């Protein structure tokens, strides 16, 4: 399916004159990856953007540099001049800005509703799934950019080649990460939808019922028009089970023999994955992917499937795969350093679900077989730790050295027996690895200094503030004397 992408922004804006009545858009929680991306696109479209967050970060600083007004802290006065208020899933009804907006009768919309407005008159490509959304979104973006199509994109993480997680393009293409955590991706009405995989996560949203989660993904795909396309990973057993229930054109990808876009002969050489992509009716592609892991080969094949259906040249696909710099905090190689006791490599990864942690460990083992793997793991949310406790224990015992931080609560209250200390006890009892529990994150550099050896691969893992620790360790160059203070 070849799509005409030449419609310009002036034409898109002319289609929605009512939206131009909106003068000021306020984002509560503007510093988050998903919120900031939409804010940046709207800012570049000419809207007055304000927002609030609990603290400054590089994202808020970037928005301010582009003309946004960002308040630190949440207070009622921040929304007084807003035409509409956008809220993230982390914002509750007791937030003073939400309460003030209701009092002032200012419309309140969720992040996905605003993303849906951006997508309404564009050729939308939405990327959903439990794992791999951010990297897949970045790879689709990279291909379309390499093809000269200048897409708008809104991603849940930094697209390193672009230096941002969102950008307003000049074409009518919009590539967006679609968030299933609160089922708000049902607001989106794209032309193409990718589903990478489906696992039990964010189950509180779905009443603890996996069947409800599966049906929600089907409903998401049925938001496609009848001429739209569902690009799905047939390697995933849940997706394979659901395919007969999808009443849209389905294109499959994966390592499976019956995949429409099939991966063959995968092997990893350090940071790069190399494999062949087989497509019916098209030439095979010998891919060099500049990010490691079989899971990233799957993400790449999803992007290749979309591009193939849109008749994008093989040359653009190959250049995008070889040239990708990946995404922030996804097997993010922060450097190799002289520690004072030899050399060590530092990698930072956002994965916080057992499946994500497992594929990251396998990528590290495959690319650097001679290195001792030292993982600094921070569990994310007490509820996830409780629900996936045994899975976490099974995965984490694969590393050589495990340094465990306590749970990053993300607003949740503690749950007895579902914390870092309990996980350490369980893993230690199995006898494969003796975890080191670090109750205060500030203690981590000195603890690591007493563990690190020549040739180590240090992997910081998790969705909380362990990413800040990774940057701190990089700034200290993993130097033992500096880490000891």
From Swiss-Prot:
Its main location: cytoplasm. SUPFAM superfamilies: MurCD N-terminal domain, MurD-like peptide ligases, catalytic domain, MurD-like peptide ligases, peptide-binding domain. It is an enzyme of class 6 (ligase). One of its GO terms (molecular function) is UDP-N-acetylmuramate-L-alanine ligase activity. The keyword Cytoplasm applies. The keyword Cell cycle applies. Its EC number is 6.3.2.8. GO terms for biological process: cell division; cell wall organization; peptidoglycan biosynthetic process; regulation of cell shape. Pfam families: Mur_ligase, Mur_ligase_C, Mur_ligase_M. Pathway: Cell wall biogenesis; peptidoglycan biosynthesis. It catalyses: UDP-N-acetyl-alpha-D-muramate + L-alanine + ATP = UDP-N-acetyl-alpha-D-muramoyl-L-alanine + ADP + phosphate + H(+). Keywords: ATP-binding, Cell cycle, Cell division, Cell shape, Cell wall biogenesis/degradation, Cytoplasm, Ligase, Nucleotide-binding, Peptidoglycan synthesis. GO terms for cellular component: cytoplasm. InterPro entries: Mur-like_cat_sf, Mur_ligase_C, Mur_ligase_C_dom_sf, Mur_ligase_cen, Mur_ligase_N, MurCDEF_pg_biosynth, UDP-N-AcMur_Ala_ligase_MurC. Cell wall formation. Belongs to the MurCDEF family. This is UDP-N-acetylmuramate--L-alanine ligase. It comes from Vibrio campbellii (strain ATCC BAA-1116). The lineage of its organism: Bacteria, Pseudomonadati, Pseudomonadota, Gammaproteobacteria, Vibrionales.
């Amino acid at each position: 399916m070849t799509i005409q992408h030449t419609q310009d922004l002036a034409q898109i804006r002319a289609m929605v004159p009512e939206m131009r009545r909106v003068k000021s858009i306020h984002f509560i929680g503007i510093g988050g990856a998903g919120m900031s991306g939409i804010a940046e696109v709207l800012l570049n479209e000419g809207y007055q953007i304000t927002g609030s967050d609990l603290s400054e970060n590089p994202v808020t600083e970037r928005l301010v540099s582009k003309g946004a007004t960002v308040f630190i802290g949440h207070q009622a006065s921040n929304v007084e001049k807003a035409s509409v208020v956008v809220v993230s899933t982390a914002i509750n009804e007791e937030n003073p800005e939400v309460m003030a907006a209701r009092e002032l009768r200012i419309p309140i919309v969720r992040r996905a509703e605003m993303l849906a407005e951006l997508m309404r008159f564009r050729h939308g490509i939405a990327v959903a799934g439990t794992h791999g959304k951010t990297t897949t979104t970045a790879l689709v973006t990279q291909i379309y950019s390499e093809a000269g199509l200048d897409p708008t994109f809104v991603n849940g993480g930094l697209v390193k080649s672009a230096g941002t997680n969102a950008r307003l393009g000049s074409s009518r293409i919009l590539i967006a990460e679609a968030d299933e955590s609160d089922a708000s991706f049902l607001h989106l009405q794209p032309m193409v939808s990718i589903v990478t995989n489906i696992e039990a996560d964010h189950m509180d949203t779905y009443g603890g019922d996996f069947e409800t989660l599966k049906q929600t993904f089907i409903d998401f795909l049925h938001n496609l028009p009848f001429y739209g396309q569902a690009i799905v990973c047939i390697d995933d057993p849940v997706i394979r089970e659901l395919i007969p229930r999808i009443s849209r054109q389905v294109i499959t990808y994966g390592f499976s023999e019956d995949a429409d876009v099939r991966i063959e002969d995968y092997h990893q050489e350090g940071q790069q994955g190399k494999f062949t992509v087989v497509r019916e009716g098209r030439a095979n592609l010998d891919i060099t992917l500049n990010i490691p892991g079989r899971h990233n080969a799957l993400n790449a094949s999803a992007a290749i499937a979309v591009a193939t259906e849109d008749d994008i040249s093989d040359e653009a696909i190959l250049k995008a795969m070889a040239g990708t710099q990946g995404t922030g905090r996804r097997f993010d190689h922060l450097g190799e350093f002289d520690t004072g006791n030899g050399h060590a490599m530092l990698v930072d990864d956002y994965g916080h679900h057992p499946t994500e942690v497992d594929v990251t460990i396998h990528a590290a083992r495959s690319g650097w077989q001679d290195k001792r793997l030292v993982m600094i793991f921070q569990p994310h949310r007490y509820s996830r730790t409780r629900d996936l406790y045994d899975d976490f224990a099974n995965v984490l015992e694969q590393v050589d050295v495990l340094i465990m931080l306590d749970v990053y609560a993300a607003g949740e209250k503690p749950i007895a027996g579902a914390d870092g200390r309990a996980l350490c006890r369980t893993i230690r009892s199995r006898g494969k690895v003796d975890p080191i529990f670090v109750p205060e994150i500030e203690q981590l550099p000195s603890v690591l200094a007493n563990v690190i050896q020549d040739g180590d691969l240090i992997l910081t893992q998790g969705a909380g503030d362990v990413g800040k620790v990774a940057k701190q360790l990089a700034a200290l160059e993993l130097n033992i004397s500096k880490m000891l203070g």
